Every structure is written in C-alpha cells, then in structure tokens.
Amino acid sequence: MTSRTAPASPVVHVIGAGLAGSEAAWQIARAGVRVVLHEMRPVRTTEAHKTDGLAELVCSNSFRSDDAANNAVGLLHAEMRRLGSLIMQAADANQVPAGGALAVDRDGFSAAVTKALAEHPLIEICREEIDGLPPQEWTNVVIATGPLTSAPLADAIRGLTDESALAFFDAIAPIVHRDSIDMSVAWFQSRYDKVGPGGTGADYLNCPMTREQYDAFVDALIEGEKVDFKDWEKDTPYFDGCLPIEVMAERGRETLRHGPMKPVGLTNPHNPTVKPYAIVQLRQDNKLGTLYNMVGFQTKLKHGAQLRVFRTIPGLENAEFARLGGLHRNTFLNSPKLLDESLRLRASPRLRFAGQMTGCEGYVESASIGLFAGLAAAADLVGQSLAPPPPTTALGALLGHITGGHIETIDAGPRSFQPMNINFGLFPPLANPPTKGPDGKRLRGPEKSVAKKQALSARALADIDAWIAAHLKLPKAA
C-alpha cells in the first residue's frame, strides 16, 4: 500500500520499519491506536540492507548478553520483555546458540517481526519513501529512520532544527559458510564453557594462532587496501563499539589480543598442551547453523584484501564468504538539545524521534527507545502524557542519556554528545551499596563489583514493575 490518505480515526504515523520503528508501531497498536508504518524499502534501498524485510539486522546477529542480573543489556532485555516487546518476542523465538549471549537467526527474526506487524488489524504498512518533512496534517509522527536516513529527509530535519546532524561510521563483519571451515584446526567452545540461552557451552568456532601467525596477520591488516573516504566523510569518527578490526590493529599490536582475539577461557582440543597466542571466534549466524560470522571483525578493507587477509587465519584457508565486511555512515541527532523528555522535537512537537538516530547504539537500545516512543505517542493521541520510566531502570537510564544526561563540556567548546550503549555507568548510584556477602564477610574487588551490579539490576526490575503498574496497566512478565 502506498496511499498517504489518513484513516478516519486518529492515527499515529511511524516512519521507518527497522528495530525502533517496528517496536514503536507494535506498542502503539497494542494501546488500541491505529498506526501507519511507512518503510521505503524496496522502493528505495540503502547500502547496508539486503532485503525488504522489516527489522532487518544489518550488522551482527547478536543482541549481546541475556544475563539480567549481571549485565546492563541483559537487564534491558528483561525490562522490554515485561513491556511486551515484539522485538524481544521475535528474538526469543528465533535464537541460535551463542554462549551467554542472545543471538538470532536474522532471516527468521525479520520474518517474525514482519508477519506480526502485517497481521495486526490496527497496523497499515505503506511501502513508500517519505522524502521530506511529514505533511502538516500528520499531527502525531514517530521518525525512526535510523542511521541510514535518506538524504532528503535528513536535509529536511536539519533545516527544521538548524542543527548539523552528527555522524559516525559503522563497520560490518564478514559471514562464512560453515562447511568451508577446516575442523581439523578449528573447534567448538564457548569462552569458559559458558552456557547461554539456546546454547550448549560449545557455541563458538575457534581458530587458534601462534605468535608468528598473529604478527603476520596484524601486519597484513595494517597494510591491506582500505575503502577510501569521500572528502565530506574524512572527519567522521567511528563509534568505538564497532571499530574496524584494522583500526584496532593500528592502535597497537597487542590491541586485538586484548579485544576480539583474546585467547582466554579456551582450550584447543587439537593441541591441548599449547596455549594459542590469539584466537579468532566465529558465531552462528542462522538457525540452520550453516553460516557463521567473524566476531569483532568489522572491517573497511576492500573485498580483495579481505579474502587475502582473512584466509591467512588457521582454519579459514579455504573459507567461502556469504558476505564480506563493509562500512556505512550513520547519522544521529544532538538529542539533548533538540528533544524533550518524551523524545519530541522541541522545534516541532508533532514529530517524535526514536531509535539509533537519537544517539543510542545497539539493536536492543534502538528497539527500547522505539518502545517508549510508541507508548508516548499513543498516550499523546488520547490526550494523556506519559512520564519516562525512572532513571533507576535500564530504559529510564538510556532515555536520560539521550535527553540530557552525560553531556560533557570540553574547555570552552561546544557540548559533546555521542552514541552510547546501555551500561551501568548511566544508572544513579545505589543509596546503600552492598558491603557484605551472604556469609557476612566484607566484599572486596570483583565480588563487590558483581554485588553492586546485581543490586542495581534488582532495583531496576522492581522499579520498572512499579512504573508499569502505575502508568500502563500491563501484566507483569512471568
């Protein structure tokens, strides 16, 4: 459908059907409000998308840790499940083994989201590009066009805000066909044999390197041909959570050994008495287990260089690649200046923003901001206002970062605002942090840190449940 004629009953328009837009549309419809979801693909595609499916995962297939007690992103998972998140439902239904992480079959995940939205009676999906500001008669709009917002819409937003959109680069990791990996060299094992959702403790493929192999690999990364930047891209920074592997290598020869190639928690069964100097890990990318992505191997190497360099990795000498790595430019808003606490544009409150373009980083973070934007948009339509969750929750802490928290002033220069993953550093401190363990002994070192995270998580889950009960009347998750 491509009609822009608004339905007779009140409606919210959501522009962009990625993770944030799909979640926003779902939450609006769950609240009993009609929604028109606009998606430009396949009418107009992007340099990173490969399909016309909704909520397509263009980078990793991992939603990261699912540990709600000890990890901030796992906590955000738990809060979103309590809030009836479609993205989390689809992720849980399409998970693949990934140690302690929640990873998904990307095609199955996108298909599940697409099906749920297409079948909802209050959701109309329009395949069209919104090539400027939404029409004035659209009085309640969620813009969730993501980091790959089309140029005409980005220019229109920039003109409305009189604010230059910020930008950074994201890099994409290669995907390898499982049957092309040499299993006389590689082996299955999760780090420290950790068992995660849908996993067995042997969920990653590991390729070992000697010191000599590692040194040669680092040299090849640094010397390999890279994609050239256009003049207007040269000052665009990388997001540190998605640095190309060759950029990490340039920062120091040992950087990779302390990052994605760290050799800890793993034992090579082919040579158990010799500790590898470095290890390359691959993670299952689809439910069939036929594809594996190279963990942490985002890259801007040219395709020929990728084939040459990555086939020097032991076990990948004959690797066949389903997808090579790539690089794309992301844009995001100066949200603390431009958006209010409900994610509305101060210059035009009928427009609300959601997802990665607000300055969050990560699949789950983007979807969670879409979730709140959808709830807030639905409340607006019936003349109500929805206060954000308390900052003690993962969702509230992330919203606080986006709409005003954690802004630094550097000397006399402008305030800086950068994309952020959810982390416990965004949470307010505990009033009474734990000092003693269950045995009564004083907590020290790592034990103290673990206890603090668990206390922050327990407080967050209690507070999100209280917020749901007070504002949303949703049933608690089991």
UniProtKB/Swiss-Prot annotation:
Q: Where in the cell is it found?
A: Cytoplasm
Q: Which GO terms describe its molecular function?
A: flavin adenine dinucleotide binding; tRNA (uracil(54)-C5)-methyltransferase activity, 5,10-methylenetetrahydrofolate-dependent
Record keyword Ribonucleoprotein present: no
Question: GO CC annotation: what is one?
Answer: cytosol
Name the coenzymes or cofactors required. Answer: FAD
Q: Where is this region: Disordered?
A: 429-448
Example GO BP: tRNA methylation
Q: Where is the composition biased (Basic and acidic residues)?
A: 438-448
Which EC numbers does the record give? 2.1.1.74
Tell me the residue numbers annotated for binding FAD. Answer: G16, A17, G18, L19, A20, G21
Q: Which NCBIfam families match?
A: gid_trmFO (TIGR00137), PRK05335.1 (NF003739)
Report the protein's function.
Catalyzes the folate-dependent formation of 5-methyl-uridine at position 54 (M-5-U54) in all tRNAs.
Regarding protein family, the annotation reads: Belongs to the MnmG family. TrmFO subfamily.
This chain's protein is named Methylenetetrahydrofolate--tRNA-(uracil-5-)-methyltransferase TrmFO
Q: What is the lineage of its organism?
A: Bacteria, Pseudomonadati, Pseudomonadota, Alphaproteobacteria, Hyphomicrobiales
Gene name for this UniProt entry: trmFO
